[in-house]
Amino acid sequence: MSNSVNISVETTCENQIREIGYDGTELYQPPPTLSESLAKCAARIDFSKTSLDDLKKEEKSAAAAADEDKDATQFQESLWPWDAVRNKLKDALTEICVLSDVISIAKDKRYLVLDPLLEEADDTKPIVQVYSRKKAISQAAQVLLSGAERLRNAHSEQRNRNVSDFHIELLRLRQNWRLKKVSNAIIGDLSYRTAGSKFGMSGTFEVTKAEETGDEDTASSSNSSSSVSGNNGMQLKASSALRVIVPAELQGVAYIKVITQKDQEDLCTAQLNLMGHGPNITAQVGVWQKTLEFAQNVLFCKELFAQLAREAIQLQAPIPHVVIGNQIRATLLPNIQLIISLCHSTTFDSSQPAPINDHDHVLEHSLHQLLREVHYKNSHHPFPHPASAPLGPTKKRMLAGPMAADRETLLDMTKSQTILEQIIAQAQHIFMRKRTQYVLDTLARDVKDPQIVSHWNAMNSPTMSCVKINIVTHGYDAIGRTSLVIHVKERSLKCICRDGRVMRLSYEPQELRDLILCQINSHQISCLISLARCMSWTVLSNSNHLGIGKVEPLGNASSCLLASPNSDRMIAVQIRCDPQIDVKVYIARSPRQDFFPSPLVPEKLWENLGGTFKEVRFDKIEGKSFLNKMEFLMASLTSNTA
């Protein structure tokens, strides 16, 4: 055929190409051997699918086939009687032989290995891994170097730039203060209206962009309008892209000074401002931060003073409060006044006195907390219960009817204390507590026998404190001790004795001193009675309120009459408060040594009535304390009797 075309035919590549050389030669992977083919086929078998269900299905199918064979052979007669037995034995022998072969193969492992075979992994050259890792590391290094270069450039630009970015500063300002845009101006608010304040003074300030000029006059005017002298009088100098303009009435430094005076003598002083006591102020970002902090502090002090002045005028006190200019005067106790002053200065004077170190942090915290409560009540009104009820009454007053509240309870619900009343109450309590401490410390120092131990409760309220007083004698603690609890209130004291008696004292310190001295008298008598019983002496009589003798300047005299075990000695003890503890001891002897019969008293038995009492020089008796001396005295009289 002249039109025939030559066609090149290539056989299909049955083997995989393992490698291609640089000259184009192809290296094929040799075909797998029989053992490798068998291993691959065995690896493809999923032995987990050969479950009991498959075996049961095969048994059912075999049983069905056997039933069909039986039906077919029922019509044929058996050629040989033992044909069925022979077939059963043959099948059993076949199964046993197969089982024996499987066991032998699995045991010897010469013909078949049951261990799983892993496929051969592709051979990778180490140099390829090295090159790939090197390339990945170089890419990561390039990313890090580019990021570091960008940071370096940004840092150098920020260092070379004298004026910070306006938008960044504005973002920081918005994170700390409330701002809004009115037309083309940016207005901020320093007031506490969002917290519930109703103070009328405006706290708005304006934010503008600082002029980028090198003129010193412009810079000085910008600094004067956007910076305020601190507590230490140093001017804040820093470059900023913002200029904060605050009202003239909010510029400067303000604080509230609280002084308590007694006869023109300062007893306690506290300075209150929004940023804490002293010149330590938390450093914030930007000059505007301190400017706004000082301005808000001025607004806070003026609002607090205005609230206190309004309450001082409205309150009806026994001694009216006086409000003169920036000063409020209130009477705490007789000859003790509370003076609250508002100090506001726009310039720093080096001749001003240094701040007083006696700062009352409790009073400062109370003023902050009380003003916060006023703001909270202004913004948080109780919801009506039920919803159709009028606004205003609290939930307790709503439930007063169903709960059958009495008139006194209803009056208590309507009572509320103002900030000034609570501050006056706290100040009165502070003075009562200091007076009580002074009286107890003075008595503990002056009275050596017995010992007076005071335990002040650490958990107290702002208007009430608690102190427990233990009166004990050294060495005789087990015999007896006298305890009493004193509740220190605003203008009074409440004393609870061990026997349950409750006494209410006024603010005079002399009343508390007299009470402690009377408790010392009763303690000495009660401990003496217990000691006498331990030494087998008889207590004939005792009294804490002796009604004979001269009238004591304070309290009552206490006495005790003791008799020896043989009733031949008697001891009379008298303790008075004049104004210190005065102890007198008398001794009488029975029978009387100076008894002589007379016509009126002829019998001698009347000599056992006892003689006259003779006073003992008690200070000359050996002993460290009153009970120790009495113990020695009773012991000596008992031994003389024996």
From Swiss-Prot:
Residues spanning the membrane: none
Keyword Transcription regulation: yes
GO biological process: positive regulation of transcription by RNA polymerase II; regulation of transcription by RNA polymerase II; regulation of transcription initiation by RNA polymerase II; sex comb development
Molecular function, one GO term: DNA-binding transcription factor binding
Compositionally biased region (Low complexity): 220-232
Region (Disordered): 210-232
Keywords on record: Activator, Chromosome, Developmental protein, Nucleus, Transcription, Transcription regulation
Primary localization: nucleus
Superkingdom of the source species: Eukaryota
Cleaved signal peptide residues: none
GO cellular component, one term: mediator complex
Keyword match RNA-binding: no
Subcellular location(s) of the protein: Nucleus; Chromosome
Family membership noted in the UniProt record: Belongs to the Mediator complex subunit 17 family.
Function: Component of the Mediator complex, a coactivator involved in the regulated transcription of nearly all RNA polymerase II-dependent genes. Mediator functions as a bridge to convey information from gene-specific regulatory proteins to the basal RNA polymerase II transcription machinery. Mediator is recruited to promoters by direct interactions with regulatory proteins and serves as a scaffold for the assembly of a functional preinitiation complex with RNA polymerase II and the general transcription factors. Required for activated transcription of the MtnA, MtnB and MtnD genes.
Subunit structure: Component of the Mediator complex, which includes at least CDK8, MED4, MED6, MED11, MED14, MED17, MED18, MED20, MED21, MED22, MED27, MED28, MED30 and MED31. Interacts with Hsf.
Identification of the protein by name: Mediator of RNA polymerase II transcription subunit 17
Organism whose genome encodes this protein: Drosophila melanogaster
Taxonomic lineage: Eukaryota, Metazoa, Ecdysozoa, Arthropoda, Hexapoda
Gene from which the chain derives: MED17
